[in-house]
Structures are given as structure tokens and as C-alpha cells.
Amino acid sequence: MEGRAAELRSRISLRVGDFLLDLPALKELFAAAKPDYVFHLAAQAFVPASWSDPWSTLENNIRGQLNVLLASIDLGTMPRILVVGSADEYGMVNPAELPIRETNLLRPNSPYAVSKVAQDMLGYQYYASHKLPVVRVRPFNHIGPGQSPSFVTSDFAKQIAEAEAGLHPPVMRVGNLEARRDFSDVRDIVRGYFLAISQGEAGEVYNLGSERSYSIGEVLETLLSASSIQMKVEPDAARLRPSDISVIVADCCKFRSRTGWRAEIPLEQSLQDILDYWRGQVRK
């Protein structure tokens, strides 16, 4: 990952700053860059943090989204904008509604999910009111090497790698293992983002996912089977959420019919890559 980042740094102009919450600075940045495409992924994306500090999540995600749209209008060149929402927008989904289509009701059940619904709707409103060429996506759970251990697959892999290295006892601390999620590799999702912004229809929204659901317990078993040691699994109440959705699985027919995209990297490969990444980090 570090080698790839170094390669990219030689090909991009990197600006560091709190631009999203500073509209004048963001407008200056847009004027200097003159973008054709705007990929807006910056957000407070950790659901539990939205419960402990909901206002920070709402401000960063909603105000940041609005500023991106305002800066795009001010630019005058109408760049294509990708608004990245979340499958969490759908919230509590009834079994009869699975797999989840873009037309499903939105029932957000966390401050984070509410913020993503607001971003989604702002994107549509600025398309409808100002003719900004906005494409919206609702990605389902995506994973890969380098992801923060705040997220479940990276958390499990990091615990295994540290236990293998003798940094702590071989005990795996877990939350809810019954929840089922639609996991895709981030490399597939990023490919989908580019297809969405380049081939998606302005004003439309598209699901991105693997169209398969796996329980968190299945993910854990796959990672444990790749470990070089035996680990004991222990529940940890601190890892449980105030509300959790039992099953999430995407229907991506709309996006596939538009672009031909589908998730290609198997879950097993993604998990092995994540575990190998953390083994490398632990050795440093």
C-alpha cells in the first residue's frame, strides 16, 4: 500500500487542509484544480462514533457535502460529481424487501445513516434545481488492506496478527456475530465509482455490492482458519451497537445494466489480503 501511495503522489497535486468545512477555501481549491470529476468520499464514516458525537458526524458529512455542491456551482464548469452515500441509508429492512433495490424505503437508524441520507438528497436536489451532473451511489460494506481497525474485518485480522506475533494472548474479542452483511473488496468498489461517475446517469442513484450476504461469524471463521495459531473467541459488550441491522444484501441490477459492473474479487481473497497486510504492519 505504501509503495502504491508513493507512486500516486508523484502524479497528483496534494493539498492538505480542512477544506470541506471552509467554503471560501474550498472554492479557491476548485478554481485552482478546475476538476472534470469530483469524487466526494470525505466523511465521518465510523457508525459508533456517530452515536457518541452525533453533531460532529452531521456537521462534517452534511455541511461538507453542501460545500462541495456550492463550490461546484461557483466554478461554473459543471463538473460531474459522485456523491458517495451508504447502504446504511436503508436502515431496518424487512425480509420481504431483500435483496435491497434503490427504490426501497430509507429508514436510517443511526446518526451516521441520517447524515448519508441527507448527503444523498442534497446531491439529488442540486441536480434537480441547478442541473449539476450529480451521480449518487450507495455502496454496501467494502473491505480491503489498509482499512482502519475500527471496521470489523480489519479489527479481526489485526487481533490475529498481533496474537500470532505474541503481542497479546490468543483471545479474539467480538461483538455481534449473527448480523449478515454484503461484503465487497474496496478495489471492486473503486472501479465501480469510476464507472458511476463516467457512465452513470446524472440524477440517478446506484447500489454497489457483492449481492451476497455473509454472517460476521462466517467472516471470523474464514480469518481464524488462515491463522497460524488457535484463538479463543470471547464476546465483548463494548463492540455491540445501540441498534444493528440483521441482514443486508444488495441488488445491483440497475448499475450492472448501465455499466456492466459486478464485484469480482472473492471474499476469501479480500480477507487473506487484509490478514497479510496486518501481519506486515505488526512486523514493522
Predicted features, each with a name:
Residues I189, Y193, L208, V219, ...:
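Non-catalytic, hydrophobic alpha-helical segments
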Residues F156, Q199-L240, C252:
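Mid/C-terminal beta-alpha module of Rossmann-like enzyme folds, strongest
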Residues M1-H142, I216, I265:
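N-terminal Rossmann-like NAD(P)+-binding domain of SDR-like oxidoreductases, especially those catalyzing
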Residues L21, S52, N60-R63, T103, ...:
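Residue-level signal for the nucleotide or nucleotide-sugar donor/cofactor binding architecture
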Residues D53, A71, L75, Q159-G166, ...:
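Generic structural signal for alpha-helix termini and adjacent loop/cap motifs
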Residues R11-S13, P133-V135, R173, E204, ...:
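Conserved beta-strand segments of alpha/beta enzyme cores
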